[in-house]
């Protein structure tokens, strides 16, 4: 079960990232100004390059880059407005996992995110996947609202620091069944 490496919806194209995209993707990463506040850390140096070359693989035995997709969200005029990744087969063999989903701050609020999530769900369903999972930092209220409003409403776990503080961080795992 593999998704397509390229698909279109309305005025957007989703395609697998290439080395030539690094500059644009780093710029989109930089547009997430409150990442450190919400997650406790910024993007590691070389994050995008590492995702393209090695994948951002889950912590499971046998994780393989052939199951990893870093995907670009691109307007028909060629402008890259975001990216996301998918890992096929985590945390189980029927689930695809999203570990990052980011729309450039300059174009947020135009329903691009909702449209892309709907297309990801349809693409995964068409490819035979039963569900999509993801993790959201609990301090990321905007992200929690976005994902729950898009049907990711089943809690699959909570991980992280056990005591709350300004410097403590936890993640909630959410899942959407593809019926």
Kindly give the residue locations of the regions a language model identified:
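Terminal substrate-recognition subdomain of acyl/acetyltransferases
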Residues: 1-5, 164-179
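Conserved GNAT acetyl-CoA-binding A-motif
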Residues: 124-135
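Conserved catalytic-core motifs of GNAT/GCN5-like acyltransferases
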Residues: 133-137, 148-170
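Short secondary-structure boundary/hinge segments and terminal tails
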Residues: 47, 125, 142, 154, ...
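Conserved glycine-rich acetyl-CoA-binding loop
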Residues: 79, 104-118, 127, 138-144, ...
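Acetyl-CoA-dependent GNAT
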Residues: 4-12, 16-108, 117-119, 123, ...
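Beta-strand secondary-structure signal
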Residues: 69, 133, 173-175
């Amino acid at each position: 079960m593999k998704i397509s490496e390229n698909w279109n919806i309305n005025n957007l194209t989703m395609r697998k990232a290439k080395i030539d995209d690094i500059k644009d993707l780093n710029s989109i990463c930089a547009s997430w100004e409150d990442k450190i506040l919400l997650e406790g850390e910024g993007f590691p140096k070389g994050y995008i390059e590492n995702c393209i070359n090695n994948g951002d693989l889950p912590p499971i035995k046998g994780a393989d880059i052939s199951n990893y997709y870093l995907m670009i969200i691109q307007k028909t005029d060629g402008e890259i407005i975001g990216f996301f990744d998918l890992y096929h087969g985590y945390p189980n063999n029927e689930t695809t996992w999203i570990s990052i989903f980011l729309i450039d701050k300059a174009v947020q609020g135009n329903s691009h995110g909702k449209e892309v999530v709907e297309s990801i769900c349809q693409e995964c369903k068409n490819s035979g996947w039963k569900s999509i999972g993801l993790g959201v930092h609990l301090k990321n209220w905007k992200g929690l609202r976005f994902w729950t409003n898009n049907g990711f409403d089943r809690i699959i776990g909570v991980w992280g620091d056990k005591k709350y503080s300004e410097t403590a961080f936890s993640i909630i795992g959410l899942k959407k069944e593809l019926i």
